[in-house]
Amino acid sequence: MGVRASLVALFLPAALAAQTPAAGAPLRLSFADAVRVASSEAPAVALAGLRTDEADARIRQARAALLPALSLGGSWLNRTFNSKSLGIDFSIPTASGPQSLPELIGPFHLFDARVNASQALFDWSSVARVRAARAQADGSRAERGVTVEGTALTAALAYLRAVRAQAVVAARQADSTIAAELVGLAEAQKAAGVSAAIDVTRARTQLVTAEGLLLVARNQLDRARIDVTRALGIDPATPLAFTDTLAATLGAADVPAARDSLVAAGLGKRPDLRAELARAGAARQTGAAIRAERLPRLEVAADYGVNGRTVPGAIATRDLTLQVSVPILDGFRREARLSEQDAVVRESQVRERDLRQQIAADVDGALLDLHSAEAQQAVAAERLRLAADELSQSRERFKAGVAGNIEVIDAQSNLIRARDTDIDARFAAATARVSLARAAGVARTLH
């Protein structure tokens, strides 16, 4: 993971920079680029990768209990001691008669230098702990998949909101253009004596309203650009140019068409379900490691070195130990830990069942939204066509002097609403396609 993250961090900014035509020009960003960058470079993904590295390091920590341990040691000691305190209370026969040992012995030096080594010969609990650490690392990798899928979804939705805001800006610009044309038409009609001053006032009011709505739309687009940069983990000041629009293919992914196939794909690919299964597996392995603590542990230990009162006078000494330990009772702490892991497994099983049902519900909901949005698109497109015809016909009536511009203003308002409805329908369809990809567990493949 560390090497992969380093390569991504090295080459991804260069790849993005290559898309920039000139210094200060906006960064051209497609929908697929946004999803790809977010799923590989977003801060949340980097943090998830680091957590995976931490879990892999814990495997090595657990494995250390099964590997040889080697150490070097040396010491110098200068001491005195009371012979009486050690129970040394006897006389030594000499030619001049029995003599007692002096009560104070020393001071004297002691030098010691040696190599210590130990190796577990049988330690099943440590073997089980290594397996548990591996299961936890698998869970961490599954959690990283959840994060990648989530960041891809976040970036996709942020991009959709941005291109929706971009479409709204284009609609409001078109509204302002029409309003300005109507002002010119009203003034011409008034100058020709076939229209009242109120018609000019109404037209100017519509123009001011359209300009105000355009300002709001531009602000929303700027805010949406910031949201996209945050989803990608890049500088919020980065200017972006969105190359995709709310077309019929935006937000597509390679997913099956049939409902049952979609559910099966979700059950097989959804990272949140994989993560839950990994958590249950880790809890089972942890429980197995706890149960293995009841088994005997066999270890061999040895040391070899030199020992003496002086360095030149030191001689070689050694120890060799074969030790077996059998846990008997630890205050029932082990049993309590087992009960905890059993509860964790049962809890995970409940979440797994709920997730399986949620996946089916997500697929059904996304399909309903998609079918509804596609139907809404057809209705919205027809409404937009009729609103444009209504505006054209009302303008002709106003030019001919057979109607006031109130009809034109009403038709213009209808066109504004029709444009918004069309944008909303296309946005809903794209969002439904993204939701369907997320339900199937393939949000990172959106294009």
Features from the language model and the residues they span:
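Amphipathic alpha-helical coiled-coil scaffold segments and their short linker/junction regions
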Residues: 35-39, 90-100, 195, 199-206, ...
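Envelope-exposed proteins and targeting segments
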Residues: 25-27, 31, 41, 66-68, ...
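Sec/SRP-type N-terminal targeting helices
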Residues: 46-50, 63-64, 105-112, 121-148, ...
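Small/polar, glycine/serine/threonine/aspartate-rich low-complexity segments that form flexible
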Residues: 20-26, 73-119, 245-256, 288, ...
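Bacterial N-terminal signal peptides
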Residues: 4-17
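Short segments within alpha-helical structural elements
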Residues: 64, 209-236, 373, 382-441
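Bacterial Sec-pathway N-terminal export signals of envelope proteins
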Residues: 18-75, 81-82, 119-120, 134, ...
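Periplasmic alpha-helical coiled-coil/stalk elements that build and connect Gram-negative outer-membrane
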Residues: 148-265, 369, 373, 396, ...
